[in-house]
Swiss-Prot record:
Sequence motif D-box, residues: 60-68
Modification after translation, per record: Ubiquitinated. Ubiquitination leads to its degradation during anaphase entry, after degradation of CCNB1.
Alphabetic keyword roster: Cell cycle, Cell division, Cyclin, Meiosis, Nucleus, Ubl conjugation
Gene3D superfamilies: Cyclin-like (1.10.472.10)
Keyword NADP (UniProt): no
Comp. bias intervals (Low complexity): 10-23, 42-54, 1082-1093
Lineage, opening ranks: Eukaryota, Metazoa, Chordata, Craniata, Vertebrata
CDD domains: CYCLIN_CCNB3_rpt1
GO cellular component: cyclin-dependent protein kinase holoenzyme complex; cytoplasm; nucleoplasm; nucleus
Subcellular location: Nucleus
The protein's name in its UniProt record: G2/mitotic-specific cyclin-B3
Organism: Homo sapiens (Human)
Impact when changing R60A: In cycB3XA; prevents its destruction after completion of anaphase
Region annotated Disordered, chain positions: 1-59, 418-464, 1074-1122
Length: 1395
């Protein structure tokens, strides 16, 4: 058995001459199917109908390809022997063709056509019996009109198996089985193919032309070579056809019946049934495609490309070995094809590529093929081919590697696939960096599969195919990270409805360049700048940092600053700011893990600075807890750093700044001066003073001696007490950390003075802490120290405390000692006092004196009362009432004076932090004074204070940590407080308790950690607000404390989202809303921030009531920090918008449009979303553009080819109306791929404005959504989710008739349900004006829309909101239908109860 020789680059000339002789001379003019295709076809096939003829031509061409390949390989002697035999066979064929044609015509009338394949001569030596048995191959295929076939090709180019009839499949399978029956038989068949090709000159010519792609025929040898290439490319398909042809030839020669052939074929089928059936289907589909286009050669070019594409990888893997065993491998490939349809195709391509000359010629031909169609078409075709490879056999796992080269059209398809494969990941990078490359490199398989159809489109572009491709293109974006850039391609292809896909090319480039390049390229500098910013932040001045922090907090407020959820709405730089805001918040939460994604923002530098600061804060917060020593030192040393960290450690910075203030504090009082001098010495360690005081107490082994000294001091003079008290007031006011700690400790003393044992207990704890000396230990173990002091020491301390109760001087000492201790004990006991005031404490308080009892009551009152201001006032009054004395009065007055007249230095230095400290310190001072009065202060007080001062001179890190922890918990522990006691929170009492808890501090470490978290998530602007407001409050002492405390407390409550989530029921209007408000107050001035800052001030403090109880919330607008928001007229503006939207209600206009459908509109909107992202426009621009399109289409008829022009022009008008810097007309011409002229755009603009009568100030859903968000204080993520839901409706035509205000309300309502924030629903109902029952039907529809959004082919909005910049809200699963129904039913029931 002779094996086939390796393919030769050239074939003997005699073959072609002989084959040309075989072809009969009577051919119909319809035989020429291609533009340049001058092939000769056997008469039997010519007699068929044009469609069947083309199908026959396809099959024959495929068979001939195989024969061509086989011709060059058999040994020369056989070729010559076959030539004679071929002549005889050809004569027989010519004789029988007419009769056969008539019979076939009759069958065509029944829509059945039998394809007579040109006889294939098999070598007599191998399969003699086959040749002798006559068989008329009747490949029955349902003849379809070219139109239907075109549609099928466009829609299901790959589903070729469905079309061929059973006979077709069986025949082909039989032919294949003949080939595969045995290796030697296959060889013989291949050898037969040579004479077959020699016989049919027309076949050779036909094959040559598809390979040459309409180029002039080269020499016959070259043509034969190309045929071999095509043969290898179409190995499976052609082999099947070859076998069929061979069998048909033998049948015709022997004139046997079909049955005999079937029997033999059945015997042959044993191996390759499935293998060949698949290629058979493909062949039939190919035939149909050829019939559709009438350009067989042109059509075959794409198949070649497909094979080359598929084979690119395989060719790389096995470049040479298969050249020699090409024919053998063909059979093997067919056999393997059964297992791997895809592999067979790939191997074919491999074989093609493996023949070097074949690869070269193939590449050249493919290039020529590309050159002929426009480059745009070429791009489409390669993609289509890959799609075919991918979808037909699912073998196109190759990725559109070849597509890139195909698009270039001048580079070999085979050579670049490697590079493409090598860097699939880089394609994403290049995708963002080089949109043009993206266009060329549609890496996603979906794109490839979609583009497969365009091959037909290139030949006969129709409107349907562009749409199909557009849909397919939408799928491609799934893989790539920067979907928006890829989607431009999708949009453009979708707009291919105009009949040309090419116009989509530039929009892609434009969008990708503007959108992803900027996003991806800039991230690196962004990160670098973050680092530099972190370094620079420390050097920046405190004040400058504070404002930045304010802005940053405003921008960052993710959950707390619910109103910053509209960063995208910033009209100045909406997209950049949006991304920046969202990124910063995300980066804070994620700790910059998503920096790569954050890089999408072009202008995140400022935000990143802020974010970096926050990161540093967060990082420092953790060490602060763990190792507060270094952190605190650094903070005290570098107030600027404190302010940088002020977001996370605002209290800490305040305490430090207070220290600085204390250093610069006025010397109004000698005692305060001394304190200041002490502070100046230990400015960095103000907290350590208290600790040192404790240390001194501890060091003075004889605490009794200190007590004696206190007694002696008491004996010395009461005047000293007065002066001391006055100084204490001033000191407390000025001592930011000391006063705070003293106050807190004294508060604890008030609660602990009753149980002095605890006081001494704390002292020993302090001693333990002091012995430890390390701040970390202090921070981590203060609780442990409190919990683990030895029992003996506790007993002795308790006894001493009893003695102290008997001797007030001792009490004073204990009080003084405790302040330091209290800083630690303060954390635990205050909670215990608030939560579980021990009876022991009560008894103790009662026993020592009425003052202690009053003091205890005051502490309780503080917890119960709404604000520290009232608490302080109450304390003052109670203290004065209990023990009216000039000393007390003077003390309070002095404290008030100090508060009223803080030194200018203090004001300037600590305007913001001072306010906090002043308010807290003043309260503490008042409280301490009250305590002292209650305790009957004596000179012992003076001594006790003086001693702490001495201690302050040698501060320790412990005090610093204590002060910082104390201050920080006061400001930031509120979320925990609210969570700990949700029921106790009332409109005011909640705030008061929060403050008292903040002072007394629950577990400080936990609070600090939570505060850090909250700061990282969204540094509370409420704190900043509290800083700013206290200044004005300080000027008016009476109101100062009230307003300051309110503002201060409100931020505490609202800064952390935990409060609301943990205690929604207990949250009253004031506390909940106020907190939300404070978060948003210091927002940027952009519109989105303006509306998001809707939570600037708490709503009027009504009881927890339902919306019915809520009076119109003027507070929402009256204190807006954004002057552009026009808070004075916010209500009137909102009412006007609702009235005006009635004038722009849309009706069902699509029925009046002749050429445009709702699907086309959806494609256009999807494209406009991409344009908005690419140009970085605001959301308002997008919404308005869509609204303009709808209004225009409602009043005028638009043609399909002008739809994109309409969309681009409407977007241009909207940009002029909404944007500060709108794109130029040329930019819009460019994104349309220059399909329209500048004059056309301007003309369309005039037309739109005339139709709309220039009335384009149209209320949109986004405006209402902003307003609702401002009113109900949603957090950033919830607001972004509602925006996503609302934007999804833009593509859906059936939402066009909904009112914008109602659509916005329903979107926000669904977002609240999804985020489990149902307790805000009554507020939404109140402010929107829509009842919940009105919104429920729309909510159901929106939930369905979200449920199936991931399955929608138009994914521009989905990908946009899947980005981390938008919190990836698109990935939040929609509510289950049953669960949603339960929620809606509960709401309805609740509403019924309220009514």
């Amino acid at each position: 058995m002779l094996l086939p020789l390796p393919p030769q680059s050239s074939k003997p000339v005699p073959k072609k001459s002989q084959s040309s002789k075989i072809v009969p001379s009577h051919h119909d003019p319809s035989e020429k199917t291609g533009e340049n295709c001058q092939t000769k076809i056997s008469p039997s096939s010519l007699q068929e109908s044009p469609s069947s003829l083309q199908g026959a031509l396809k099959k024959r061409s495929a068979f001939e390809d195989l024969t061509n390949a086989s011709q060059c390989q058999p040994v020369q002697p056989k070729k010559e022997a076959n030539k004679e035999f071929v002549k005889v066979v050809s004569k027989k064929i010519n004789r029988n063709t007419h009769a056969l044609g008539l019979a076939k015509k009759n069958k065509r009338n029944l829509k059945w056509h039998k394809l007579e394949v040109t006889p294939v001569v098999a070598s007599t030596t191998v399969v003699p019996n086959i040749m002798e048995k006559p068989l008329i191959l009747d490949i029955s295929t349902t003849s379809k009109t070219p139109n239907t076939e075109e549609a099928s090709l466009f829609r299901k180019p790959l589903v070729l198996k469905e079309e061929p009839t059973i006979e077709d499949e069986t025949l082909i399978n039989k032919s294949l089985s003949l080939k595969k029956c045995s290796n030697h038989e296959e060889v013989s068949l291949l050898e037969k193919l040579q004479p077959l090709q020699e016989e049919s000159d027309s076949d050779d010519a036909f094959v040559i032309e598809p390979m040459t792609f309409k180029k002039t025929h080269k020499t016959e040898e070259a043509a034969i070579t190309k045929k071999t290439l095509s043969l290898k490319k179409k190995m499976c398909a052609s082999q099947r056809k070859q076998s069929c042809q061979e069998e048909s030839l033998a049948v015709q020669d022997v004139n046997m019946e079909e049955d005999s052939f079937f029997m033999e074929s059945m015997s042959f089928k044993k191996k390759p049934k499935t293998e060949e059936s698949i290629p058979t289907h493909k062949l039939s589909s190919l035939k149909k495609k050829c019939t559709i286009y009438g350009k067989i050669c042109h059509f075959r070019k794409p198949p070649v490309l497909q094979t080359t594409i598929c084979g690119a990888m395989s060719s790389i893997k096995k470049p040479t070995t298969e050249k020699e065993t090409l024919f053998q491998e063909l059979s093997v490939l067919q056999e393997k094809h059964t297992t791997e349809h895809e592999m067979s195709i790939l191997k074919k391509s491999l074989a093609l590529q493996k023949t070097n000359f074949k690869e070269d010629s193939l590449v050249k031909e493919s290039l020529a093929f590309k050159k002929k169609p426009s480059t745009e078409e070429a791009i489409m075709m390669p993609v289509i081919l890959k799609e075919q490879c991918m979808t037909e056999g699912k073998r196109s796992r190759l990725k559109p590697l070849v597509l890139q080269e195909i698009t270039s059209g001048e580079k070999s398809l085979i050579m670049k696939p490697l590079s493409i494969k090598e860097k699939p990941s880089t394609e994403k990078e290049s995708f963002s960096q080089e949109p043009s490359a993206l266009q060329k490199k549609h890496t996603t398989q979906e794109e490839v599969s979609i583009l497969k159809e365009p091959s037909s489109l290139l030949k006969s572009p129709t409107e349907e195919s562009p749409f199909d491709e557009a849909l397919a293109f939408t799928k491609k974006c799934t893989i790539e990270e920067a979907p928006p850039t890829k989607k431009p391609l999708i949009l453009k292809r979708k707009h291919a409805t105009q009949g040309t896909m090419s116009h989509l090319k530039k929009p892609l480039i434009l969008q990708t360049t503007s959108g992803e390049k900027s996003l991806i390229k800039e991230p690196l500098p962004f990160k670098e700048e973050k680092v530099s910013l972190k370094k620079k932040c420390t050097t920046q001045e405190m004040m400058s940092i504070c404002p930045e922090l304010l802005d940053f907090q405003d921008m960052i407020g993710e959950d707390k600053n619910s109103f910053f959820m509209e960063p995208m709405s910033f009209r100045k730089n909406p997209t950049t700011e949006e991304t920046v805001l969202t990124k910063t918040s995300l980066s804070l939460q994620e700790k910059k893990i998503t920096q790569g994604k954050m890089s999408h923002l072009k202008k995140p530098l400022v935000l990143q600075k802020i974010t970096s600061e926050e990161e540093s804060f967060y990082k420092k917060l953790l060490p602060f807890k763990m190792k507060s020593t270094t952190e605190e030192k650094f903070l005290s040393q570098e107030p600027s750093a404190l302010k940088e960290k002020h977001t996370t450690l605002q209290e800490v910075s305040l305490s430090k700044e207070s220290l600085a203030i204390q250093e610069k504090a006025t010397t109004e009082e000698e005692f305060s001066q001394e304190l200041f001098s002490l502070h100046v010495k230990h400015t960095n360690k103000s907290g350590s003073l208290f600790q040192e005081a404790l240390v001194l107490q501890e060091k003075t082994d004889a605490e009794e001696d200190s007590l004696k000294n206190l007694l002696a001091l008491q004996e010395k003079s009461t005047m000293e007490e007065e002066s001391l008290i006055n100084k204490l007031l001033a000191l407390k006011e000025e001592l930011s950390a000391e006063a705070a700690t003293n106050i807190q400790t004294q508060l604890s003393l008030k609660k602990k003075s009753t149980s002095h044992g605890k006081v001494f207990f704390l002292k020993k704890q302090l001693a333990l802490n002091e012995t430890i000396n390390e701040e970390e230990f202090l921070n981590k173990q203060p609780l442990a120290l409190e919990g683990y002091p030895s029992i003996a020491e506790g007993e002795t301390l308790f006894k001493k405390l009893l003695a102290m109760q008997e001797e007030p001087s001792i009490e004073k000492e204990a009080v003084l000692k405790e302040p330091t201790i209290d800083t630690e004990a303060h954390f635990k006991e205050p909670l215990a006092l608030q939560e579980e005031p021990s009876t022991e404490k009560e008894a103790v308080l009662k026993e020592p004196s009425v003052d202690t009892e009053a003091h205890f009551k005051e502490t309780l009152a503080l917890q119960e009362k709404p604000s520290i201001e009232q608490e302080a006032l109450f304390k003052r009054h109670s203290a004065l009432w209990e023990k009216p004395s000039t000393e007390k009065e003077t003390i309070f007055k002095e404290s008030l004076d100090l508060q009223e007249k803080p030194s200018i230095k203090k004001e300037t230095l600590l305007k913001k932090p001072l306010a906090l400290k002043m308010s807290t310190i003043n309260e503490a001072v008042l409280f301490e004074d009250m305590i002292a009065l209650n305790e009957k202060p004596t000179t012992g007080k003076e001594l006790s204070f003086k001693e702490p001062l001495a201690l302050q001179e040698s501060p320790t890190y412990k005090e610093d940590t204590f002060l910082k922890t104390l201050l920080v918990p006061q400001v930031g522990t509120s979320p925990n407080v609210s969570s700990t006691a949700p029921e106790s929170i009332t409109s005011k009492s909640s705030i008061a308790t929060m403050t008292s808890v903040g002072k007394s501090g629950t577990i400080n470490e936990a609070f600090l950690f939570e505060d850090m978290i909250t700061l990282n998530e969204k540094p509370t602007t409420g704190k900043e607000l509290s800083f700013k407001e206290p200044l004005a409050l300080q000027e008016s002492p009476t109101c100062k404390e009230d307003t300051f405390l309110e503002t201060f407390l409100i931020p505490q409550i609202g800064t952390s989202p935990y409060v609301f989530s943990t205690t929604p029921e207990s949250i009253t209007e004031k506390s909940s809303i106020a907190t939300m408000t404070s978060v948003g107050k210091s927002r940027t001035t952009t519109e989105s921030s303006a509306c998001e800052s809707a939570s600037d001030k708490p709503v009027s403090p009504q009881a927890k009531g339902t919306p019915k109880e809520i009076t119109p919330r003027e507070d929402i607008d009256e204190d807006s920090s954004d002057p552009s928001f026009n808070p004075m007229y916010a209500k009137e503006i909102f009412s006007y918008m609702k009235e005006r939207e009635e004038q722009f209600i849309l009706t069902d206009y699509m029925n009046r449009q002749i050429e445009i459908t709702s699907d086309m509109r959806a494609i256009l909107v999807d494209w406009l979303v991409e344009v908005q992202v690419s140009f970085e426009m605001t959301h308002e621009t997008l919404y308005l553009a869509v609204k303009l399109v709808d209004l225009y289409l409602m009043k005028a008829v638009c043609k399909k080819d002008k739809l994109q022009l309409l969309g681009a022009t409407a977007f241009m008008i909207a940009a002029k109306f909404e944007e500060h810097n709108s794109p130029r007309v040329d930019d819009f011409v460019y994104i349309c791929d220059d399909n329209y002229q500048r004059s056309e755009v301007l003309s369309m603009e005039i037309n739109i404005l005339n139709v709309l009568k220039c009335d384009i100030n149209i209320p949109i859903a986004y405006h209402f959504l902003r307003r609702y968000a401002r009113c109900i204080h949603t957090n950033m993520k919830t607001l972004t989710l509602s925006r996503y839901i609302c934007e999804m409706t833009l593509q859906e035509y059936h939402y066009v008739q909904e009112k914008a205000s109602k659509l916005a309300a329903a979107s926000l309502l669904l977002a609240l349900y999804m985020k489990k924030l149902g307790y805000w629903v009554p507020f939404l109902e109140h402010y929107s004006g829509y009842s919940i029952s009105e919104l429920h039907p729309l909510v159901r529809q929106l939930n369905k829309l979200l449920t199936f959004s991931s399955y929608d082919s138009l994914k521009a909005v989905y990908y946009k909101y899947s980005h981390p910049v938008f919190f990836e809200v698109a990935k939040i699963p929609a509510l289950d239908m049953l669960k949603l129904e339960e929620i809606l039913n509960c709401d309805c029931e609740a509403q019924g109860l309220v009514l």
